[in-house]
Amino acid sequence: MTRSPLHRLIFGGLRRLLYLWVRSETINQSSMTLNLDRSRPVFYALPSPALTDLAVLDHECTKAGLPRPVLPVAVGPLQEPAAFFYLTPDPDWLGRQDKSGAPPTLERLVAAVSQHAEEDAQIIPVSVFWGQTPASESSPWKLLFADSWAVTGRLRRLLTVLILGRKTRVQFSAPIHLRELVQHNKGHERTVRMAQRLMRVHFRNLKAAVIGPDISHRRTLVKGLVHAPQVRQAIADEAQRENLPLAKAEAQALRYGNEIASDYTYTAIRFLEVVLSWFWNKIYDGIKVNHIEQVQGIAPGHEVIYVPCHRSHIDYLLLSYLLFRNGLTPPHVAAGINLNMPVVGNLLRRGGAFFMRRTFKGNPLYTAVFNEYLHTLYTKGFPVEYFVEGGRSRTGRMLQPRTGMLAITLRSFLRSSRTPIVFVPVYIGYERVLEGRTYLGELRGASKKKESVLDIFKVFGALKQRFGQVYVNFGEPIRLAGFLDQQQPGWREQDHGPQYRPDWLNAATARLGETVARHLNEAAAINPVNLVALALLSTSRLALDERALTRVLDLYLALLRQVPYSPHTTLPEGDGQALIEHVRSMNLVAEQKDALGRILYLDEGNAVLMTYYRNNVLHIFALPALLASFFLSSSRMSRELLGQYVHALYPYLQAELFLRWTPEQLDEVIDQWLVALVEQGLLRQDNDLYVRPAPSSRQFVLLTLLARTITQTLQRFYMATSLLINSGQNSLSAEALEDLCVMMAQRLSILHGLNAPEFFDKTLFRHFIQTLLQQGVLHADAQGKLGYHDKLGELAEGVAKRVLSAELRLSIRQVALHRDDGLETSTL
């Protein structure tokens, strides 16, 4: 553009036109401190072709009295039409660049200086930055177009100039003297490469200092994936299986890699930080973080895998935001391919998301590429985040772990255990989830809808509500090597080839998933909404007098302070009255005043929604509620009998709620809770007997409300066992029993007015049946029909009559005996 007088004339006009809008300055007055030898010719090196960058450079050179880059210059007999060159060639319209080869101007300069000993040329590397540094920029709109490490096309460059041109900065760097390089006598080609390398490293380091480091591995990693031995073998197998040329199968593997891989950019991280800072402090009342210091202590020297619970779509962004704000590297986040939507998907990818398909079944090439991608992340030490629950919990409970990602992680660690892997559980608790109303529909039986970009905008309609606070608790880390030492001693001595899949792997993976789930529950953040939901949903009319509700909340807080669930569990600040006022301000409870005071209650919509928040902390109260349940139908009970019944029910509660204690630890915890219940007046101890309060007393009401928090869970257990016993030995398959349990639960919920749709959640019944099989209480014959041990009758009647009222047991037995399921038992 500037190689002839006419071109220079046109260029001058364009520069003046550009500066009608653009304003530029040099960084740290770098143009004034170059220490140039004015007797030697000066050339300018720009990192990549951009006419706007050249115009800004020419403008700043004119301001500083430096030689202009667009004017001719001579080096001995060599006459150059302009005093600048680009280190990389011009990109095409798609933004693609061929970085091979050296700039012709540099080739000629090295030749001229080499051939004429008295000559030298000074090359000044110049970098032009559009807009402020990402760390200083506060406008999310401007951050979208800020300088990044990605190669950009002309359209984006135009938008960058228009949006960021008022704050353009130029960095002049110390000149490189070609004479000094030539004096190394490395020959022409090596000297040219040396000069290129010097400038390339310089530009990279300067850019990292100004806009942040290049944290994207996408451009190099994806191509490297197809050269891994496991992927090469999968490519060859794919080509043979599908009768494809090898090149086509390799191209397919590359497409899979690009579909999967994240594309981290510092500017995207800063953009998300700015937007999310507004979001958490305007939509929510901020974020309360606990125990992050332990992560800061273990992150150096470890491959950290964050395993949060999954409650909302914004979980994907929340943890990355918090880690970035606390000086930790944001992780690469596993996201479902359904989130790879227009606009949103690209932003998530640049924020660190990598995308995975819901199933790998029937696609071994995709499986090989994905496994190798994760293995590369782990071995290179990139932090990773994935959700062991798989999808978002619609009920507020911890879902049963999906072990696919854990299995991939375990196999990767067995391949290479040089970098120690540590899992960091992260509990995320919301006082109100953004998708609450969507979950409400699904809780009421609506089918789960596929995510759409429009869902993002639907949420904005609810943003006038108050969403309260977000709580993030970092749980106890799980060191993978130590876990394997416990599960499989001697694993280090086994042959861990790339295809190594030992017999014990599946069982170890399942136990790892359960361990992660337990550690997540241990880190629960109990908030005011959880406790108010727990109290009101335990009443028969979903209502309490304000003074009574205050007493219940004060009791729960006192119990939890006396017997903490775990060192990582956190409690809300304030007393019961403060908790009520907080929940009232969020419009989650309705109220009615009369002459005697204020009654707080749950209306129909909030009653279902509040089951979600109750379920968040149901595991915290499971054991004290179970102990309280034994005193609803018995006025007194011995410590021995209490222990016997708790031990009988505990395996099923532990499996459903991921309770933290082993059977060996249970007696000690039972004693701690009995002491607390006695001190709070809910029980009285008489030697080895524990006695309930008088049925007319306030303490008995409190004991009853505590017991009711676990009643629905115990009802489901009794339903399943009653149906099985009434059907007889080897009459029902597990699937048929599940279906009957769901129908029975739906009928009972109508008869008893239960407003809790998860009461007839099929997955809860399925898991209970699986636990009965694991405990040896049930067994399946060759046809899949279920037989049962005598212990089932003891569990169904001996224990149930202690924790469920006679009326409730009778109602369940009647439905079980007179069921009209439309199916003959013999055909099930």
From Swiss-Prot:
Gene Ontology biological-process annotations: CDP-diacylglycerol biosynthetic process; fatty acid metabolic process
Signal sequence annotation: none
Entry EC number(s): 2.3.1.15
Localization terms from the record: Cell inner membrane
InterPro entries in UniProt: GPAT/DHAPAT, GPAT/DHAPAT_C, GPAT/DHAPAT_LPLAT, GPAT_PlsB, Plipid/glycerol_acylTrfase
Intervals of motif HXXXXD motif: 309-314
Catalysed transformations (reactions): sn-glycerol 3-phosphate + an acyl-CoA = a 1-acyl-sn-glycero-3-phosphate + CoA
Pathway(s) where this gene product acts: Phospholipid metabolism; CDP-diacylglycerol biosynthesis; CDP-diacylglycerol from sn-glycerol 3-phosphate: step 1/3
GO cellular component: plasma membrane
A Gene Ontology molecular function term of the record: glycerol-3-phosphate O-acyltransferase activity
Keyword set, alphabetical order: Acyltransferase, Cell inner membrane, Cell membrane, Lipid biosynthesis, Lipid metabolism, Membrane, Phospholipid biosynthesis, Phospholipid metabolism, Transferase
Coiled coil location: none
HAMAP family: Glyc3P_acyltrans
Comment, domains: The HXXXXD motif is essential for acyltransferase activity and may constitute the binding site for the phosphate moiety of the glycerol-3-phosphate.
Protein family according to the UniProt entry: Belongs to the GPAT/DAPAT family.
Family annotation (NCBIfam families): plsB, PRK04974.1
Protein name from the UniProt record: Glycerol-3-phosphate acyltransferase
Organism listed in the record: Pseudomonas putida (strain ATCC 700007 / DSM 6899 / JCM 31910 / BCRC 17059 / LMG 24140 / F1)
Gene: plsB
